[in-house]
Amino acid sequence: LDDRAGCAMLLAMIREELPCDCCFSFTVQEEVGCFGGKTAAYTLRPDIAIAVETTTAGDLAGVPEEKKVCRLGNGPVVSFMDRGTIYTYDLYKRVRALADAHNIPNQTKEAVCGGNESRSLMTAAGGSEVLAISIPSRYLHSPACVADEKDIENTLELLRLLPEALAL
């Protein structure tokens, strides 16, 4: 599912009439240096960039509470920070408030871990405001990756609200 679920959600949005101009980038080589994100930043020069991906849930029996980064069934994960990026705090607050205002369950990562293309988008080509919205998943990077269908639906619902809410 990593990052096919994110691609599927973006493809659904591309088919819709959006209230403002949006660019969608399907990048490569995230796991080996975020090279696709850097190329996208130089090509598109976005004001705001949102990484849509999956993140490790770790909500399994026997895993200590401090290692449970997020939980399946609690909605999309809106991160404030990971190993490569400190996300735009105002953007983080606005997206969490937007989800709450629309009764979309959401959560934040409870540990600083992982990383994604945001680190390249934040710094390349003059940088942009960045945020990551992730689907909590178990067994990430394996053929048995598991996600909650409701989390995927709630993530897409939140993503659909962003173009109008964040339009510059």
Segments and roles (model prediction):
Residues G73-L156, L162-L166:
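Active-site-adjacent substrate-binding region
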